[in-house]
């Protein structure tokens, strides 16, 4: 069920038993209304607290950035692999610290050709390491 951070009321009000229940949080920093600077994105990723209701898992997230800059040269993943490595690592660490874990938007997309939404492509392009534990070695936060 959706976490209280969705702002749609008490997700437990209609449930009589919470055994085996967990909350799902979809967190897309792309839509956070941040200043379009890489430091603002890293700051948000490093400090976000997704805890709210417990247990919660971040069941959807990506490396996408605001639509106004996502296709500019400065923000294209192939032009700044280092930023996207840090952006990925910061989110992984935050979601593992303040939630019960995470699930990236998609393992593989068709036709999109954007590693910000495609985990396998991000691995192939060197943005995400094959071993997700390396997030703690990137020095993102």
Report the location of each language-model feature.
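Extracellular glycoside hydrolase catalytic/binding regions
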Residues: 1-89
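Short, Lys/Arg-enriched charge-dense amphipathic segments
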Residues: 16-30, 124-141
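Substrate-binding cleft of secreted/luminal carbohydrate-active enzymes
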Residues: 52-139
């Amino acid at each position: 069920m959706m976490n209280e951070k969705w702002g749609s009321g008490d997700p437990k009000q209609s449930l009589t038993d919470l055994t085996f229940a967990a909350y799902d949080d979809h967190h897309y920093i792309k839509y956070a209304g941040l200043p379009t600077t890489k430091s603002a994105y890293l700051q948000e990723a490093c400090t976000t607290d997704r805890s709210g209701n417990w247990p919660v898992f971040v069941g959807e997230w990506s490396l996408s950035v605001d639509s106004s800059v996502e296709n500019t040269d400065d923000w294209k993943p192939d032009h700044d692999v280092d930023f996207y490595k840090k952006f990925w690592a910061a989110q992984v660490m935050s979601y593992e610290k303040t939630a019960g874990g995470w699930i990236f938007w998609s393992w593989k997309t068709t036709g999109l050709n954007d590693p910000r939404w495609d985990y396998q492509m991000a691995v192939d392009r060197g943005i995400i390491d094959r071993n997700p534990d390396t997030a703690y070695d990137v020095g993102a936060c």
